[in-house]
């Protein structure tokens, strides 16, 4: 898969899970939006991952319009346009997408549907979309804070800038997303891996993630190759990390 597309699809992690948090609330010690959610998640993430935040994570809100601008911007530089045009041509030649499908606007709409929040390694800020349901915002914060912690030890920005080596980029993205998904699930289960490790437990969680994705209209209408490209780093990455 193309470098630029994989980089943008990495932003969609918050839309992958709808499990209910069993974590106990803690006294907030952070300021700004979602201070209570951040204060609750940080110590659990540090315990699960085994690393401490070097600096407090930053979190801000973004309007849906700002998210659309951000997503659109990822496709507008000359290299991105060239990559997407080539990928679209290859998909059509192989019969993987309809001849009438325009990949760039479709991906923009798909990502808008998926994104509840994202961590930007360039600004070092976790962004949550205004008006997001509370449960989804909590899941987003937990997942993306894992990325914020990863970024304090390994530069995620440098990984996202990998060029001309899609296999390397895909492997790195799957490791980062896989850890975030797996630790998020563990935290949602109260810090226990019992349900994950029970016979059939992990398979059921994978099914739940796929079912949730399929409930989203644009994702459900997407060609199979786009669906699998979107979901691969999360499911297969978590399987590897497990």
Residue positions per predicted region:
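Active-site-proximal alpha-helical
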Residues: 179, 188-190, 210-242
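C-terminal motif of bacterial Sec signal peptides marking the signal peptidase cleavage site
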Residues: 19-22
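Post-HExxH zinc-binding segment in Zn-dependent metallohydrolases
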Residues: 151-157, 161-209
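Active-site recognition of the HExxH zinc-binding catalytic motif
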Residues: 45, 139-156, 180-181
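Acidic helix-start/capping segments at beta-turn-to-alpha-helix junctions
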Residues: 55-74, 163-167, 198-207
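Short pre-active-site segment immediately N-terminal to the catalytic Zn-binding motif
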Residues: 126-141, 171-172
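Catalytic zinc-binding patch centered on the HExxH motif and its immediate surroundings
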Residues: 69-82, 102-123
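Bacterial signal peptide processing site
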Residues: 24-26
């Amino acid at each position: 898969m193309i470098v630029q597309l994989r980089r943008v699809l990495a932003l969609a992690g918050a839309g992958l899970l709808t499990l209910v948090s069993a974590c106990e609330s803690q006294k907030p010690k952070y300021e700004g939006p979602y201070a209570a959610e951040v204060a609750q998640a940080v110590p659990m993430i540090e315990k699960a991952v085994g690393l401490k935040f070097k600096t407090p994570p930053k979190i801000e809100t973004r309007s849906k319009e700002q998210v659309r601008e951000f997503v659109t911007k990822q496709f507008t530089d000359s290299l991105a346009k060239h990559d997407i045009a080539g990928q679209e041509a290859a998909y059509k030649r192989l019969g993987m997408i309809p001849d009438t499908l325009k990949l760039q606007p479709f991906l923009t709409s798909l990502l808008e549907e998926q994104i509840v929040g994202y961590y930007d390694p360039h600004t070092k800020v976790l962004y949550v979309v205004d008006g997001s349901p509370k449960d989804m915002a909590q899941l987003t914060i937990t997942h993306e804070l894992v990325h914020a912690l990863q970024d304090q030890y390994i530069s995620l920005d440098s990984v996202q800038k990998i060029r001309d080596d899609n296999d390397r980029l895909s492997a790195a993205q799957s490791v980062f997303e896989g850890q975030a998904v797996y630790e998020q699930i563990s935290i949602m289960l109260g810090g226990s891996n019992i349900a994950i490790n029970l016979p059939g437990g992990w398979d059921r969680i994978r099914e739940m993630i796929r079912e949730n994705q399929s409930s989203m209209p644009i994702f459900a209408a997407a060609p199979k190759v786009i669906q699998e490209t979107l979901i691969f780093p999360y499911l297969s990455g978590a399987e590897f990390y497990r």
